From Swiss-Prot:
Catalytic residues (positions): D69 (proton acceptor)
Matches recorded under Pfam families: Maf
Keyword Disulfide bond: no
GO terms of biological process kind: nucleotide metabolic process
EC assignment: 3.6.1.9
Keyword Hydrolase tagged: yes
Domain of life the protein comes from: Bacteria
Designated name of the protein: Nucleoside triphosphate pyrophosphatase
UniProt function note: Nucleoside triphosphate pyrophosphatase. May have a dual role in cell division arrest and in preventing the incorporation of modified nucleotides into cellular nucleic acids.
Length: 190
């Protein structure tokens, strides 16, 4: 059965590759600006549900579609993708030396199964090096990530402690997804 990743995220694609999951990547457009909530948990859930509804239109008998959405929460204040360098700097200042939460809602739909999961990755951060912040902002890498959080590079050396579910922090609950894929395979045999 073909797996489609309904996301343009390179981090999500890399997670699937690292776990040996073959997939095709397709962009699904969902207007997140239409969501009026500022509650991080509600927002990420509704965004993922919206993407899941779009995915249903692509669903055939021979495919599984995976979608996800992530936001960052600092003191219960939501951080999405920064619109510009100034907003990126504000996000990083709020994160500096604090605990951050990456909330990821992952979902899968197949002809036999619909699975949705909302998980949280928590990390306590050390203070950022101001010269490294400047380099990071100049690199433009922050533009790809909710809250400008890149656990795979910029944020990694600043993590004092964290929860163990790193894939959630990177944008997809791979462990949960693997379980859903196994269950879906069993159900399709019935």
């Amino acid at each position: 059965m073909e797996l489609i990743l309904g996301s343009q995220s390179s981090a999500r694609a890399n997670l699937l590759k690292e776990h040996g999951i073959k997939f095709e990547q397709k962009a699904l457009y969902f207007d997140e600006e239409s969501l009026k909530t500022t509650d991080p948990r509600e927002f990420v859930y509704l965004a993922c549900k919206g993407k899941l509804e779009k995915a249903k239109k692509l669903l055939t008998n021979h495919c599984v579609i995976v979608v996800a959405d992530s936001v960052v929460s600092v003191d219960n204040r939501m951080q999405r993708k920064a619109k510009n360098k100034q907003e990126a700097l504000e996000f990083l200042k709020r994160q500096n030396g604090n605990e951050i939460e990456v909330l990821t809602c992952s979902a899968l739909i197949s002809p036999v199964l619909e699975w949705l999961d909302l998980s949280v990755f928590r990390a306590r951060l050390k203070a950022f090096d101001s010269s490294e912040i400047e380099k990071y902002l100049e690199s433009g890498l922050w533009q790809e990530s909710a809250g400008c959080v890149r656990l795979e590079d910029f944020h990694r050396p600043y993590i004092k402690s964290s929860s163990k579910n790193l894939s959630v922090g990177l944008g997809l609950n791979v462990e949960g997804l693997l379980g859903a894929l196994k269950l879906g395979a069993k159900l399709s045999l019935l």
